[in-house]
């Protein structure tokens, strides 16, 4: 969670105190969309594989839909009810089908795979990848297997220090790999 404080720069008094969760979620979604624009090429059709149907799953989809036509989404969440809510909420942003996966492997068939879960276990396996798939492991813990990271063609981060401190690369950074 976060808090946004708006302070008058001339007088130094508070103008507003706001919950920062929404803007943080939107920013994180935008990071993926902008990175994808440069890695994949703007304007292409996308089949999105999504792990995590919470607020981050929503904002990731919304941001990607700003730059790409999402022709299909396959979403996996440990809570089927959350995946069903996501599917209903995201209809305006997706130009095609929204599939709810009952097995995490089923969401790995997209052009991109976005992991936005709170899982502390490595559940995304390297062998699930299709050649050319772009993986965005956005969670605070390591959602993808070591092999996903070690066999990646490229690893792109927005902030090296933060990437080595938490998320998919933390274990690799702390062990010097």
State where each predicted segment sits.
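NAD(P)-binding Rossmann-fold cofactor-contacting core
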Residues: 67-90
